[in-house]
Amino acid sequence: MANIYYENHADLARLAGRTIAVIGFGSQGHAHALNLKESGCDVIVGLYQGSKSWSKAEGLGLKVLPVAEAAKEAQIVMLALPDTAQAAIYRDAIGPHMTPGKTLMFAHGFNIRFGQIVPPEGVDVSMVAPKAPGHRVREVYTQGGGVPALVAVHQDASGNALADALAYARGLGCTRAGVIETTFAEETETDLFGEQVVLCGGVSALVKAAFETLVEAGYQPEVAYFECMHELKLIVDLFYQGGLNYMRYSVSDTAEWGDYTAGPKIITDETRATMKRILADIQSGAFAEDWIEENHNGRPRFNAYRTRDIAHPIEQVGRELRRMMPFVNPREVVPGEGGA
């Protein structure tokens, strides 16, 4: 069983007298900076000159500095940046200031696991990864709670890397819920696998294939959208609250019977073998190598995939149907806009 740490395992006083630089002010960065500040920590935010987030962070009472200055001033540096941006920013602005005795922290292990960032000896390297989007990390903290998190140590130069990481997690509010000890490799590999096989790749492909099957069989696209896309949230919410058993308790007996009889026909031995190959590509670094090369080349395939899927009929039908349902708080992505 995993080691799980709570409030009594974490001493926030370990952060006293130390400045924490949160590099980035996006989804995770803003939550980290504000939660730590309200937990009594000395926090600065590191941003590039001209960042749209600069005035926003200052407006929330945070001290903002250029990235290099923030890294120089701080004793603890948290990289709360997109994976693809971290290596260059670390090389140019952060690495030169990672002197012995400092701590370099991550909210995701990609760049350490795949060797894109190699910290110097004498520096603690750890990770605190809240298991929720930044807005949720912030919201739950302000309500007096916390979201679970993962904690890991890659390099323990001081002998106190885990204790300091747990103190940081307490500053975020995560020890109120529980912090699970892991490794950079486990966090990174399972995170990528979950995204590819279930949360993004698997679900997206399943929804599109089911929608296409119904439409090709002559059913109306609008009805197919409701059955294959819209109602998915109803089921996922049940998973979220009580797992598979609660979902089956909540749906009709007919739906439950279909679950048992049809599900194994969708997830076949061949599908499981494919999952294992995907995991092997993640573990070997093949996926990371491909993704890093894609970014170096200007993302031609990535952009082509995005353009292709924006034009899928399920997106066109969904856009129209969501206008009928303002209560779902519809969102529309403008072509060319990026995500995280």
Curated annotation (Swiss-Prot):
Cofactor note: Binds 2 magnesium ions per subunit.
InterPro entries in the record: 6-PGluconate_DH-like_C_sf, KARI, KARI_C, KARI_N, KARI_prok, NAD(P)-bd_dom_sf
An example Gene Ontology molecular-function term: magnesium ion binding
Positions annotated to bind substrate: 252
Residues reported in the UniProt entry to bind Mg(2+) 2: 191, 227, 231
Active site per UniProt: 108
Domain KARI C-terminal knotted: start-end pairs: 183-328
GO terms of biological process kind: isoleucine biosynthetic process; L-valine biosynthetic process
GO CC, one annotated term: cytosol
UniProt: Mg(2+) 1 binding residues: 191, 195
Catalyzed reaction equations: (2R)-2,3-dihydroxy-3-methylbutanoate + NADP(+) = (2S)-2-acetolactate + NADPH + H(+); (2R,3R)-2,3-dihydroxy-3-methylpentanoate + NADP(+) = (S)-2-ethyl-2-hydroxy-3-oxobutanoate + NADPH + H(+)
Pathway: Amino-acid biosynthesis; L-isoleucine biosynthesis; L-isoleucine from 2-oxobutanoate: step 2/4; Amino-acid biosynthesis; L-valine biosynthesis; L-valine from pyruvate: step 2/4
Pfam entry (one): KARI_C
Positions contributing to NADP(+) binding: 25-28, 51, 53, 83-86, 134
NCBIfam families according to UniProt: ilvC (TIGR00465), PRK05479.1 (NF004017), PRK13403.1 (NF009940)
HAMAP family documented for this protein: IlvC
Stated role: Involved in the biosynthesis of branched-chain amino acids (BCAA). Catalyzes an alkyl-migration followed by a ketol-acid reduction of (S)-2-acetolactate (S2AL) to yield (R)-2,3-dihydroxy-isovalerate. In the isomerase reaction, S2AL is rearranged via a Mg-dependent methyl migration to produce 3-hydroxy-3-methyl-2-ketobutyrate (HMKB). In the reductase reaction, this 2-ketoacid undergoes a metal-dependent reduction by NADPH to yield (R)-2,3-dihydroxy-isovalerate.
Family to which the UniProt record says this protein belongs: Belongs to the ketol-acid reductoisomerase family.
Name the UniProt record assigns to this protein: Ketol-acid reductoisomerase (NADP(+))
Organism from which the protein derives: Roseiflexus castenholzii (strain DSM 13941 / HLO8)
UniProt lineage: Bacteria, Bacillati, Chloroflexota, Chloroflexia, Chloroflexales
Gene name linked to the record: ilvC
